[in-house]
Amino acid sequence: MESQQLHQNPRSLHGSAYASVTSKEVPSNQDPLAVSASNLPEFDRDSTKVNSQQETTPGTSAVPENHHHVSPQPASVPPPQNGQYQQHGMMTPNKAMASNWAHYQQPSMMTCSHYQTSPAYYQPDPHYPLPQYIPPLSTSSPDPIDSQNQHSEVPQAETKVRNNVLPPHTLTSEENFSTWVKFYIRFLKNSNLGDIIPNDQGEIKRQMTYEEHAYIYNTFQAFAPFHLLPTWVKQILEINYADILTVLCKSVSKMQTNNQELKDWIALANLEYDGSTSADTFEITVSTIIQRLKENNINVSDRLACQLILKGLSGDFKYLRNQYRTKTNMKLSQLFAEIQLIYDENKIMNLNKPSQYKQHSEYKNVSRTSPNTTNTKVTTRNYQRTNSSKPRAAKAHNIATSSKFSRVNNDHINESTVSSQYLSDDNELSLRPATERI
């Protein structure tokens, strides 16, 4: 009875029969891949049933004698070799064109082994979260600190730690492409591919290999969906779908233009003028900056330009701020004309200052040479000093002679006084003291 039921419903009881047989016949040290059907998850058993229903039921002669030991896992799908994701071969350009980039709509993990240089593409499983890191194409690290410690570490562990590179974010809109391409170029540089990226002049150091080209091709399409690319990028890829370097070269050129725009805005916001340079030079500088911004589709109004110029005026030009403070209709040409007028007036005044100073100095020299009392005395004193200058010995002789002569005269005067006094005594005359006589 049971044999008839088994013969009528072999598929419904295949799992239980397989479990009963394998539980008895499989030894304890069995291969971990040969798992019983009872231990498989439900979705695996469902997939096994679907595959068995699609295949044609073989005849009794084609069925092996011990058919319960056939592995339920399909032999065409190998087990995952690198973590959670199944390994696929690199998509060729023909397949990529035929699929219209449908294979690269989500970020992917592109890993390379320590001894393998060609990239491999991994399609993420929808049941697992997206990867957060992408190992670079080359395993060599430019960091000298890591190269010093490479002998003390295990090569496999070193590859896992050092070869993780943060991937760029996925492009979300056409307007964000200029920002996204900066992160993508940084990602390629961190992947040791900086020498094949065009520099600011559009030059590259070396030609890339096929593996490197495929790596750039795959990563670019993985993180930049085709429908979100700008029009100029689509035009390049329509001519040559794999010409990613041309896209990068033009992106670098556009980044330089954007940098120049930023520099022009900074220069315009930090304008300063005090008259040290000519007004014509200042006008040419400001007009060149405004014209360059206009060529990049950035229009600077006269009012904004006047406000930025007035903010940087100093010296004699500073009073123009008050003059333009109440004006609503500012004209850049009028402001330049007034700056030129003030500059010309200051220039004329500076030219007249040296002549006035020269006349004043000449007047001072004439007044010094004109005769006056002080200068006459000085001249006379100098003249006497020059004529009466005698040797020191002669001066001493003259002084001694004059003192001797004065001494002789004094003695003569004293003798006459004494004789007159004797005469007075002889006549018995009373004389008053000399003080009273006076």
From Swiss-Prot:
Give the compositionally biased regions (Polar residues): 1-11, 19-39, 49-60
The coiled-coil segments of this chain are none
Keyword Cytoplasm attached = yes
Compositional bias of kind Low complexity: 369-382
Looking at the record, which segments are called RNA-binding?
Answer: 295-397
One GO MF term: RNA binding
- Keyword tags: Cytoplasm, Transposable element
Cross-referenced Pfam families:
TYA (PF01021)
Q: What is any one GO biological process for this UniProt entry?
A: viral translational frameshifting
Site note Cleavage, residues? 397-398
Has keyword Cytoplasm?
yes
GO CC annotations?
A: cytoplasm
Residues spanning the signal sequence = none
The free-text domain remark for this protein reads:
The C-terminal RNA-binding region of CA is sufficient for all its nucleocapsid-like chaperone activities.
Question: Subunit notes for this chain?
Answer: Homotrimer.
The function of this protein is: Capsid protein (CA) is the structural component of the virus-like particle (VLP), forming the shell that encapsulates the retrotransposons dimeric RNA genome. The particles are assembled from trimer-clustered units and there are holes in the capsid shells that allow for the diffusion of macromolecules. CA also has nucleocapsid-like chaperone activity, promoting primer tRNA(i)-Met annealing to the multipartite primer-binding site (PBS), dimerization of Ty2 RNA and initiation of reverse transcription.
Please, what other remarks does the record include? Retrotransposons are mobile genetic entities that are able to replicate via an RNA intermediate and a reverse transcription step. In contrast to retroviruses, retrotransposons are non-infectious, lack an envelope and remain intracellular. Ty2 retrotransposons belong to the copia elements (pseudoviridae).
Question: What is the protein name given in its UniProt record?
Answer: Transposon Ty2-C Gag polyprotein
Q: Which organism is it from?
A: Saccharomyces cerevisiae (strain ATCC 204508 / S288c)
The gene name reads: TY2A-C
